[in-house]
């Protein structure tokens, strides 16, 4: 049976994905983790939950080992509007969490999934019938 860790579980995608995966794999096989325990009360009541700052590699690794995780979903991201106001903070959080996820997955033989970001696109990207291979000039990168 898969043992899944969803980091950034309290966000827009994670809050929907955790209950769905728990319905498939069982509540105890899907661990939700987020920096904010307050916004994850429903997730914590339904199955395992860990408060985690994904930039803390030691704490992140400890959770992977504690639950015997074999699959990591990295959903950690600063919202685009916040990132536009503070691009360095967005870089530190988004890339830092991704880097930790990749190294921890490699070191613990885990599969890893991390989605792309709408923030990869900018004002010059075509808004209608956007091609698969298109211009990417983010407004939220340094």
Regions found by a protein language model. Give the residues of each.
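Residues at the starts of beta-strands that form the adenosine-phosphate
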Residues: 3, 28-29, 111
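N-terminal Rossmann NAD(P)H-binding glycine-rich loop of SDR-like oxidoreductase domains
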Residues: 3-24
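SDR active-site strand-loop-helix element
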Residues: 7, 33, 72-76, 112-118
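Conserved glycine-rich Rossmann-like NAD(P)H-binding loop of the short-chain dehydrogenase/reductase
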Residues: 26-37
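Rossmann-fold cofactor-recognition segment
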Residues: 44-56
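NAD(P)H-binding glycine-rich loop region in Rossmannoid oxidoreductase-like domains
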Residues: 54-93, 122-123
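Conserved Rossmann-fold NAD(P)-dependent oxidoreductase catalytic core, especially the SDR/UDP-sugar
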Residues: 99-140
């Amino acid at each position: 049976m898969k043992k899944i860790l969803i980091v950034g579980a309290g966000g827009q995608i994670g809050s929907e994905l955790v209950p769905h995966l728990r319905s498939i794999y069982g509540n105890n096989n899907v661990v939700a983790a987020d920096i904010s325990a307050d916004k994850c009360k429903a997730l914590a009541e339904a199955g395992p939950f860990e408060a985690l700052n994904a930039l803390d590699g030691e704490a992140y690794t400890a959770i992977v080992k504690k639950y015997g995780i074999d699959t990591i979903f990295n959903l950690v991201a600063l919202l685009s509007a916040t990132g536009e106001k503070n691009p360095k903070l967005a870089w530190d959080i988004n890339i830092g969490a991704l880097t930790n996820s990749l190294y921890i997955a490699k070191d613990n033989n885990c599969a890893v999934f991390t989605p792309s970001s709408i923030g990869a696109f900018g004002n010059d990207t075509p808004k209608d019938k956007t091609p698969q291979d298109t211009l990417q000039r983010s407004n939220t990168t340094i």
